């Protein structure tokens, strides 16, 4: 078997016979996989924290993404060659879907745990023993997190602080207060407070290029990136009774394949009269229901458009299916699939207006229901698409952070303070164990210190010296709120700064990192491009 080689990214590979494929096994396989995780963590670690750096990524199609969001970076890197890389991407997607933030921390912590595991492997400790010891360490760390967590007192204020913590490292940090307020208000408007749950589908995020990020607004209603179908239609309907149509505004057609042969002008005239009659019947169905505005999922031709305008019925065509569903929820209306089924009870109630944005006169339709806002829209403004897309990612992360506070009312403080406190606790707890298990628990504690170490490095501090001082400071003061001064203002008390995470989010980060490490340590064979 040939020696283990690494490429420029530190990923392991072997040169083998083409027919036999590539195979790495035993401890060599574990070390190779650890190297893969380490290389990815090294790349991601500079993006951690409020002073983390951005990455610019270019796809094969030459699309450019500028971001410091860990999940987005992993997704856009398109790491498909190495199975461990794909595993990390899948775990990051799971973390992003469940918690919404903390992907970078998960990968950095997993890499630190694997570094500790590599040291133990060098001492002859079996991978399974290391995994079991890490699981014990995880259990004690979770218990300690629960002990140092605090119950929130003011829900909205805590949500605001959670949003600020999430947004502090993002592109929107200069408008931190405004974006935090927008995210908090959006969640409070549509959340089910009795069940302490939130349906993200009720928060629509739309965007328009123009102005700056500070012009981003929360609209108590639905924003549709469309305009009224005719320029002479009314631009505002204050007492809108909205017909939500999923049927096409056109004469009925045979469902089977067919052709229509017209042999003379009379037949053409008859066809024209038939179409006019059908259009008139559709208009009459709408007017009979009491509707004074139409939202249609399909398009319609100029003749139908003219008839709608002549009958004083403002209309919007090509409304997306998701938008139509949101309109139904927000206005209390029902989506109708046939004109003849349209009744007054199906109509939604709301104020509808067309707005012009920017110098290019881009238009949007705003549907507002002040009395009962069951859905909201965050309209993001920005100089270009790159800025807007990163702002939208930042908003989604902040919404998740606020949601986590809603679903779990206990918090732990950030800035690396919780990780350092857990590390100190595990050091004390490990004295009750012996042998390999004790070493694994101590290794778990040392790995947790990688988070404050990384935050200190990204903030311009001497990472090792600063981390040692923080460790000493927590031990002497017994204050587990002390963390890394990322902003350089001399304040290390995260409670005073209002920097925290939901307890559930922090626990999930620890669990995800440990699960990844356990999987890596249990893999002793990697076979790729194998041929019989």
Curated annotation (Swiss-Prot):
GO cellular component annotations of the record: chaperonin-containing T-complex
GO molecular function per UniProt: ATP binding; ATP hydrolysis activity; ATP-dependent protein folding chaperone; unfolded protein binding
Main location: cytoplasm
Domain of life per record: Eukaryota
Compartments where located: Cytoplasm
Keywords (A to Z) from UniProt: ATP-binding, Chaperone, Cytoplasm, Nucleotide-binding
Annotated family: Belongs to the TCP-1 chaperonin family.
Functional summary from the UniProt entry: Molecular chaperone; assists the folding of proteins upon ATP hydrolysis.
Classification via PANTHER family: CHAPERONIN
Subunit relationships: Component of the T-complex protein 1 (TCP1) complex.
Protein name (record): T-complex protein 1 subunit epsilon
Provenance organism: Encephalitozoon cuniculi (strain GB-M1) (Microsporidian parasite)
GN (gene name): CCT5
């Amino acid at each position: 078997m040939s020696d283990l080689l690494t490429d420029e990214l530190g990923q392991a590979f072997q040169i083998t016979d083409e027919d036999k494929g590539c195979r790495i096994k035993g401890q060599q396989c574990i070390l190779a996989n650890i190297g893969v995780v380490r290389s990815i963590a090294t790349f991601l670690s500079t993006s951690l924290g409020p002073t983390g750096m951005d990455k610019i990524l270019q796809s094969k199609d030459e699309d450019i993404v500028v971001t410091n969001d860990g999940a987005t970076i992993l997704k856009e890197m398109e790491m498909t060659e190495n199975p461990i890389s794909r595993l990390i991407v899948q775990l990051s997607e799971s973390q992003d879907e469940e918690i919404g933030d903390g992907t970078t921390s998960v990968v950095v912590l997993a890499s630190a745990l694997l570094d500790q595991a590599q040291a133990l492997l060098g001492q002859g400790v079996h991978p399974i023993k290391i995994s079991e010891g890490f699981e014990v360490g995880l259990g004690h760390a979770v218990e300690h997190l629960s002990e140092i967590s605090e119950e929130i007192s003011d829900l909205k204020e805590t949500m605001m602080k959670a949003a600020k913590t999430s947004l502090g490292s993002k592109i929107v940090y200069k408008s931190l207060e405004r974006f935090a307020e927008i995210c908090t208000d959006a969640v409070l408007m549509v959340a089910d407070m009795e069940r302490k749950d939130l349906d993200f589908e009720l928060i629509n995020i739309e965007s328009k290029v123009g102005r700056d990020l500070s012009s981003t607004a929360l609209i108590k209603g639905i924003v549709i990136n469309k305009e009224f179908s005719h320029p002479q239609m009314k631009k505002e309907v204050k007492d809108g009774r909205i017909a939500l149509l999923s049927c096409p505004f056109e004469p009925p057609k045979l469902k089977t394949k067919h052709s229509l042969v017209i042999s003379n002008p009379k037949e053409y005239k008859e066809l024209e009269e038939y179409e006019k009659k059908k259009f008139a019947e559709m208009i009459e169905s709408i007017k009979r229901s009491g509707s004074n505005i139409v939202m249609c999922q399909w398009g319609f031709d100029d003749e139908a458009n003219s008839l709608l305008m002549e009958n004083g019925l403002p209309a919007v065509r090509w409304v997306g299916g998701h938008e139509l569903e949101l309109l139904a929820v927000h206005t209390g209306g029902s989506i109708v699939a046939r004109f003849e089924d349209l009744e007054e009870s199906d109509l939604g109630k709301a104020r509808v207006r067309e707005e012009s944005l920017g110098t290019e006169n881009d238009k949007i339709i705003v549907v507002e229901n002040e009395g009962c806002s069951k859905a909201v829209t965050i309209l993001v403004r920005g100089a270009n698409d790159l800025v807007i897309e990163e702002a939208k990612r930042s908003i989604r992360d902040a919404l998740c952070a606020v949601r986590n506070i809603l679903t779990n009312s206990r918090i732990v403080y950030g800035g690396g303070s919780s990780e350092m406190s857990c590390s100190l606790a595990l050091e004390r707890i490990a004295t009750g164990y012996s042998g390999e298990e004790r070493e694994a628990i101590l290794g778990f504690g040392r790995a947790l210190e990688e988070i404050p170490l990384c935050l200190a490095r990204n903030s311009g501090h001497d990472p090792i010296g600063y981390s040692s001082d923080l460790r000493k400071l927590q031990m002497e003061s017994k204050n587990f709120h002390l963390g890394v001064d990322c902003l350089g203002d001399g304040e290390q008390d995260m409670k005073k700064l209002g920097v925290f995470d939901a307890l559930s989010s922090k626990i999930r980060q620890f669990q995800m990192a440990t699960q990844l490490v356990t999987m890596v340590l249990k893999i002793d064979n990697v076979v790729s491009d194998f041929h019989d």
